[in-house]
C-alpha cells in the first residue's frame, strides 16, 4: 500500500517551493492572490497588444488611427495621381526635346542609333561638326519648336558667346606605328572657338558679308587627329513647355544645356558621336494665360494632405512612445519583483513595426508635398526627387493597410508566412549572394570584352538575374555563339559558365528557396498559432483572463465593432494574430 505520508510530503514540498509560473496552479489548494499592482500591469499589457476591434470592446475607444489611415490613403493616392500627370508631361517634354535636338544637330541621325552613331573618316567628322554649328545658327528657321539663344552658354569656354566649339588634345604627341614608337605628353590642352548666334530680326542684305565673316570663323577649324582626345560643342537654348496648360497649370520655362561630344579617346579609327542635354526649369517672367483657372484648389488639397499626415504622425509617434514607456515599466517591475532581466527580443515586442512604417511614410509625404508646393509655385524644379518621395510614401501607406487585414484570420497567411520564413530566407540569401557575386565578377572580367550584356558589373548582375527567371536565355547564348570565331577558348568558357550558372540557380537555388517558403506555409497551417512559439511576454500576458467585454479595462461601450475589424474572434487566436 502507498504510504499516506508520501503524497502529503510531496504536496507540502510543492507548495513551499517557489513557483515562477504565471498564475496557473495545479492541485486542490487555491493559488495565492495576484498583487493588484501586477494584475494592473498585466491588464495594461494586454490592452496595449489588443487589436483596434478589441480596444473598442474594452473601452469603447473608436479606431481613430484606422479611420485616419483610410482617409490618408485616399488623399495621398489622389495627390500622387495629380502629381504623376504633371511629372509625366515634364519628363515627356524633356525627352522629346532631346530627340529633336539629336535629329537637328547630328548629321544622318536615326532613332535607336545612339550606340552605333559614329564617324569613320576625317571628312565625315568635319561634316558632322560643321553641320551641328550650321544648324545652331539657322535654328529659328529650321526648327519646329520655339527656341531662343542664350549668350554665355553656361560654359567657361564660351567666353560670353552663344556656342563653344572646343577640341582637346595632348600637349605633345607623336605616334609612329611603322617603327612601333610614340612620344606622348599626357597633359591635355583645350582650344575653343566662340560662335555667336545671328541677331534677330535678320540683317539687311548690305550686312550679309559682315554676318558671314563673323559667324563662319569655325570653318577654319583644324583638328590635330594624331593627338586628338575629343571635340565638344556646347550651347544653351531656352523654350517654354505649354503642355502644362492641359492640367490647368502655369507653363514652365526651360533652359536646355546641350553638349555634343565627338569622342576619340580610344584612337581606334572610330569616333562615337553623342548628344546629351540637361534641363533647368525656372519660373517664367510675367506669365499671362487667358482664362486660366484658379490653382488654389491644388494648394488647399496639399495643405489637407500635410495636416492629415501630421495628425497621423502624432498619433503613431504617441503610440510608439507609450510602448516605450510601458516597456520600461515592465522591465523595472520584473526586476524589482522577480529579479528577472528582460531580453532584447522581448523588449522589441513593444516596438510596433507598423507604426514605424506609418511614421516613415508620413515624413516622406510631408516632405514631398512641401516640395510639390514649391514646384507648382515655380520656386523648385526637383521633379525627380519629389516623385521619389511621394511614390515611396504611397507605397508604404498601402503596405500599412496589411496590418489591418491581418486581424482577419484568413488574411493573415501572407504576413504569418513571411514572419516564419524570413530568418531562414535571410540566412539562405547570404550564402547565395556569395556565389552570385562570384559569378558576376567572373563574367564581367572574362566575357565583358566579348558580350554586350557583360560590359559592366551592373549589366552582368541584371543579365544573370534575368537568366534565373528564364528571360533572354537564347539571346545570351546566341550572342556568345557569334564570338566563337574570335576566341574559341572564351566561347568554351562561356558555355561552361552559362550552363553551370543556369543549372545551379534554377534547379537548386530556386528550388530550395521555394522549399523554404513552402515549409513556412506548412508550419503555420498546424493548429496553435502562426507557426512561432509563444514568447514569455505573451505567456505572461495570457494569464490575464479578463475578456475585452469584461468591463475591467475601464468600462466602455459594448456595441458591435466596426466592419473593418474582426468580429467574433476565437480567444485562442487572439494572440496568434497579433502583428507587432
From Swiss-Prot:
BP GO annotations: adaptive immune response; calcium ion export; cellular response to calcium ion; cellular response to pH; iron ion transmembrane transport; monoatomic cation transmembrane transport; positive regulation of lysosome organization; protein homotetramerization
GO molecular function: calcium channel activity; intracellularly phosphatidylinositol-3,5-bisphosphate-gated monatomic cation channel activity; iron ion transmembrane transporter activity; lipid binding; monoatomic anion channel activity; NAADP-sensitive calcium-release channel activity; potassium channel activity; sodium channel activity
UniProt KW Isomerase keyword: no
Motif window: Dileucine internalization motif: 573-578
Regulation: Channel activity is controlled by multiple regulatory mechanisms in different subcellular compartments. Channel function is transiently modulated by changes in Ca(2+) in a pH-dependent manner; pH changes modify the aggregation state of unitary channels; a negative cooperativity between extracellular/lumenal Ca(2+) and H(+) is suggested. Regulated by phosphoinositides in a compartment-specific manner: in lysosomes activated by PtdIns(3,5)P2 (Phosphatidylinositol 3,5-bisphosphate) and at the plasma membrane inhibited by PtdIns(4,5)P2 (Phosphatidylinositol 4,5-bisphosphate).
Stretches of the chain found on the membrane's Extracellular side: 87-298, 372-382, 449-456, 478-491
Transmembrane region(s): 66-86, 299-321, 351-371, 383-405, 428-448, 492-513
Cytoplasmic compartment residues: 1-65, 322-350, 406-427, 514-580
Keywords: Adaptive immunity, Calcium, Calcium transport, Cell membrane, Cell projection, Cytoplasmic vesicle, Disulfide bond, Endosome, Glycoprotein, Immunity, Ion channel, Ion transport, Lipid-binding, Lysosome, Membrane, Phosphoprotein, Transmembrane, Transmembrane helix, Transport
Name used for this protein in its record: Mucolipin-1
Amino acid at each position: 500500500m502507498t504510504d499516506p505520508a508520501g503524497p502529503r510530503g510531496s504536496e507540502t514540498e510543492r507548495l513551499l517551493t517557489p513557483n515562477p509560473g504565471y498564475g496557473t496552479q495545479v492541485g486542490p489548494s487555491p493559488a495565492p492572490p495576484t498583487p493588484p499592482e501586477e494584475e494592473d500591469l498585466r491588464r495594461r499589457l494586454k490592452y496595449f497588444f489588443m487589436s483596434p476591434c478589441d480596444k473598442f470592446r474594452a473601452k469603447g475607444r473608436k479606431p481613430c488611427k484606422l479611420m485616419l489611415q483610410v482617409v490618408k490613403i485616399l488623399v495621398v493616392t489622389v495627390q500622387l495621381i495629380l502629381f504623376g500627370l504633371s511629372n509625366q508631361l515634364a519628363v515627356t517634354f524633356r525627352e522629346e526635346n532631346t530627340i529633336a535636338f539629336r535629329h537637328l544637330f547630328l548629321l544622318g541621325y536615326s532613332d535607336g542609333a545612339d550606340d552605333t552613331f559614329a564617324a569613320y573618316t576625317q571628312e565625315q567628322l568635319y561634316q558632322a561638326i560643321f553641320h551641328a554649328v550650321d544648324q545652331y545658327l539657322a535654328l529659328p528657321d529650321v526648327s519646329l519648336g520655339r527656341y531662343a539663344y542664350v549668350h554665355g552658354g553656361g560654359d567657361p569656354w564660351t567666353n560670353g558667346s552663344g556656342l563653344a566649339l572646343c577640341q582637346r588634345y595632348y600637349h605633345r604627341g607623336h605616334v609612329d606605328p611603322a617603327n612601333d614608337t610614340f612620344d606622348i605628353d599626357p597633359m591635355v590642352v583645350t582650344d575653343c572657338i566662340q560662335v555667336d548666334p545671328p541677331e534677330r530680326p535678320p540683317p539687311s542684305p548690305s550686312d550679309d558679308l559682315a554676318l558671314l565673316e563673323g559667324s563662319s570663323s569655325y570653318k577654319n577649324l583644324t583638328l590635330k587627329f594624331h593627338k586628338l582626345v575629343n571635340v565638344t560643342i556646347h550651347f544653351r537654348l531656352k523654350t517654354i513647355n505649354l503642355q502644362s496648360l492641359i492640367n490647368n497649370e502655369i507653363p514652365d520655362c526651360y533652359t536646355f544645356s546641350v553638349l555634343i561630344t565627338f569622342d576619340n579617346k580610344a584612337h581606334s579609327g572610330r569616333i562615337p558621336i553623342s548628344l546629351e542635354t540637361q534641363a533647368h526649369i525656372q519660373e517664367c517672367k510675367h506669365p499671362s494665360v487667358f482664362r486660366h483657372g484658379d490653382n488654389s484648389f491644388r494648394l488647399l488639397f496639399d495643405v489637407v494632405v500635410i495636416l492629415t499626415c501630421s495628425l497621423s504622425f502624432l498619433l503613431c509617434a504617441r503610440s510608439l512612445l507609450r510602448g516605450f514607456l510601458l516597456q520600461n515599466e515592465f522591465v523595472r517591475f520584473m526586476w524589482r519583483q522577480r529579479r528577472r532581466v528582460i531580453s532584447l527580443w522581448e523588449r522589441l515586442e513593444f516596438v510596433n513595426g507598423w507604426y514605424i512604417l506609418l511614421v516613415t511614410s508620413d515624413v516622406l509625404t510631408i516632405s514631398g508635398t512641401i516640395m510639390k508646393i514649391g514646384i507648382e509655385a515655380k520656386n523648385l524644379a526637383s521633379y525627380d526627387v519629389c516623385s521619389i518621395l511621394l511614390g515611396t510614401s504611397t507605397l508604404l501607406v498601402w503596405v500599412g493597410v496589411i496590418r489591418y487585414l491581418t486581424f482577419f484570420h484568413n488574411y493573415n497567411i501572407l504576413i504569418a508566412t513571411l514572419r516564419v520564413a524570413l530568418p531562414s530566407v535571410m540566412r539562405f540569401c547570404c550564402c547565395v549572394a556569395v556565389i552570385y557575386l562570384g559569378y558576376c565578377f567572373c563574367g564581367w572580367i572574362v566575357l565583358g570584352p566579348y558580350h554586350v550584356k557583360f560590359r559592366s558589373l551592373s549589366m552582368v548582375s541584371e543579365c544573370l538575374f534575368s537568366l534565373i527567371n528564364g528571360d533572354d536565355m537564347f539571346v545570351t547564348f546566341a550572342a556568345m555563339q557569334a564570338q566563337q570565331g574570335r576566341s574559341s577558348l572564351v566561347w568554351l568558357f562561356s558555355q561552361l559558365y552559362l550552363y553551370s550558372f543556369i543549372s545551379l540557380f534554377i534547379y537548386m537555388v530556386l528550388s530550395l528557396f521555394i522549399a523554404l517558403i513552402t515549409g513556412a506555409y506548412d508550419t503555420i497551417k498546424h493548429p496553435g498559432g502562426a507557426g512561432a512559439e509563444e514568447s514569455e511576454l505573451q505567456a505572461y500576458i495570457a494569464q490575464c483572463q479578463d475578456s475585452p467585454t469584461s468591463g475591467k479595462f475601464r468600462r466602455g461601450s459594448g456595441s458591435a465593432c466596426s466592419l473593418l475589424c474582426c468580429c467574433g474572434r476565437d480567444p485562442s487566436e487572439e494572440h496568434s494574430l497579433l502583428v507587432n
